[in-house]
């Protein structure tokens, strides 16, 4: 089993979970800052946005998680802020981040569609890295299986939880996000292939589809009244993405992303 603490200096402990999230953040900021000027948004605007959005997204992700695990946290109030032990919900972070983005664009008079198109691939890449934090913490795993011989030994060992090998759903989602990132990065280079907003719509459809399937394999999903919350949110993302694309394609005068 991998030690969840990457580095310890006196009372200060740096967790792998935090390093995975921060690594994803750094990559996301780099990618977005390189792409932003092509759509008339300065790199400084990206940095300013991240300084506001990232901490709020972490808080939002934690609140989302705590709400749906309230039966536990109401008895352990001191653990509510212990995010270093895991327990942040991606959808909570995404929803918070999207709301902050809309508010930021309104305040700075920026086109939110352009901003969302720039952010989407960057977020996908960050998620691909961030999921490895779940691997270290032995969370976001799937059902018990007899063996995992198709995986490297270090993954097999870390996925041996509570006396059984577990489906590495974190790995499936990480790979799915990475594949989606590669596809959209290649696609957006093709002239007149994507309208403004369709990169963001692709993210909604792609991530929603993958999460909808993968969530069904998990055993530690957040539940509400016996329902897997993330599957319903995923289905909603897919529907929103499809409706968005259909409406954009029917509208006249919508610019191509590459213009």
From Swiss-Prot:
GO MF terms, alphabetically ordered: phosphatidylglycerol-prolipoprotein diacylglyceryl transferase activity
Listed pathway(s): Protein modification; lipoprotein biosynthesis (diacylglyceryl transfer)
Compartments, as annotated in UniProt: Cell membrane
TM regions (residue ranges): 12-32, 41-61, 80-100, 109-129, 167-187, 194-214, 226-246
Pfam family, one: LGT
Residues given in the record as a 1,2-diacyl-sn-glycero-3-phospho-(1'-sn-glycerol) binding sites: 131
InterPro entries in alphabetical order: Lgt
Membrane topology according to the record: Multi-pass membrane protein
Record keyword Cell membrane present: yes
GO biological process: lipoprotein biosynthetic process
UniProt keywords, alphabetically: Cell membrane, Membrane, Transferase, Transmembrane, Transmembrane helix
EC numbers, comma separated: 2.5.1.145
Location, primary (coarse class): membrane
Keyword Ribonucleoprotein: no
Any one annotated GO CC term: plasma membrane
NCBIfam families given in the database record: lgt
Function: Catalyzes the transfer of the diacylglyceryl group from phosphatidylglycerol to the sulfhydryl group of the N-terminal cysteine of a prolipoprotein, the first step in the formation of mature lipoproteins.
Family: Belongs to the Lgt family.
Protein's UniProt name: Phosphatidylglycerol--prolipoprotein diacylglyceryl transferase
Species this chain originates from: Streptococcus pyogenes serotype M3 (strain ATCC BAA-595 / MGAS315)
Organism phylogeny: Bacteria, Bacillati, Bacillota, Bacilli, Lactobacillales
Gene: lgt
């Amino acid at each position: 089993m991998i030690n969840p603490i990457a580095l310890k200096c006196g009372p200060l402990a740096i967790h792998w979970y935090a390093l995975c999230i921060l690594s994803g953040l750094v990559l996301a900021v780099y990618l977005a800052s390189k792409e932003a000027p092509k759509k008339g948004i300065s790199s400084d605007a990206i940095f300013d946005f991240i300084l506001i959005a990232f901490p709020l997204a972490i808080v939002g992700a934690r609140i989302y998680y705590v709400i749906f695990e309230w039966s536990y946290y109401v008895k352990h109030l001191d653990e509510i802020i212990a995010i270093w032990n895991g327990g942040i919900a991606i959808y909570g972070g995404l929803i918070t981040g999207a709301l902050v983005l809309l508010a930021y664009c309104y305040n700075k008079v920026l086109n939110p569609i352009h901003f969302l198109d720039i952010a989407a691939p960057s977020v996908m890449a960050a998620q691909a890295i961030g999921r490895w934090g779940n691997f270290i913490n032995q969370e976001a795993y799937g059902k018990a299986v007899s063996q995992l011989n198709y995986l490297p030994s270090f993954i097999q060992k870390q996925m041996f939880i509570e006396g059984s090998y577990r489906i590495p759903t974190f790995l499936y989602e990480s790979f799915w996000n990475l594949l989606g990132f590669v596809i959209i990065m290649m696609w957006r280079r093709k002239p007149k292939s994507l309208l403004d907003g369709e990169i963001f719509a692709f993210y909604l459809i792609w991530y929603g589809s993958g999460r909808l399937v993968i969530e069904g394999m998990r055993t530690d999903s957040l539940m509400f009244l016996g329902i897997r919350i993330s599957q319903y949110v995923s289905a909603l993302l897919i529907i929103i993405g499809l409706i968005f694309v259909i409406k954009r394609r029917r509208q006249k005068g919508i610019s191509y992303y590459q213009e």
